[in-house]
Amino acid sequence: MKQIIPYGKCYIDSHDINEVKKSLKNSYLTSGPFVKKLENNIKKKLKVKYAVSCNSGTAALHLAFISIGLKKKDIVILPVINFVAASNILKMMDIKIIYSDVDINTGQITPAAIEECIKKNTLKKIKAIVTMPLGGFPENIEQFYKIKKKYNCFLIEDACHALGARYRF
């Protein structure tokens, strides 16, 4: 059976509503036990050592860009189809953006397109590549890791659309 999952439609059940009620009745405005529980659940699910929650994907991207030490005039490759937050933050930081073409079927950046961007900018070192699993469909992240290693740059996966999604099962 083929099931269509509508883009942008949320599924909220009674459990979700009850958790929000508990959070609102809690005396913490920020941080607190619910945030710690979320971060611990994400660490467990993704099998990572650290997880820091943010109030938005935009804030998370900003933290990621700061954490890799981006400086003015550094170069970052972004997919041409992307949420505007990444571009806005990089522009605010005075970072040069190279927009990469995307696959016509998936709307996602491809390893071949990244290689093409890098070849066109041979005199400049690429500081980071940002991928985005558009619509919740994870890309072949292993190929991007190979490119990251080959060019000694950072790889940031903007997983707002696909947190917890897996490429291989």
Model-inferred region functions:
Residues 1-29, 33:
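N-terminal "arm"/small-domain region of PLP-dependent enzymes with the aminotransferase-like
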Residues 9-10, 101, 134:
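Conserved donor-binding loops in enzymes that form glycosidic bonds
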Residues 12, 30, 82, 105-106, ...:
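Glycine-/small-residue-rich active-site loops that bind phosphorylated ligands and cofactors
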Residues 20, 42, 60, 76, ...:
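Generic structural signal for small/hydrophobic residues in well-ordered secondary structure
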Residues 28, 32-75, 89-93, 99-101:
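Phosphate-binding glycine-rich loop
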Residues 64-124:
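Conserved PLP-anchoring active-site segment centered on the Schiff-base-forming lysine
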Residues 105-169:
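Active-site phosphate-binding strand-loop segment of PLP-dependent enzymes
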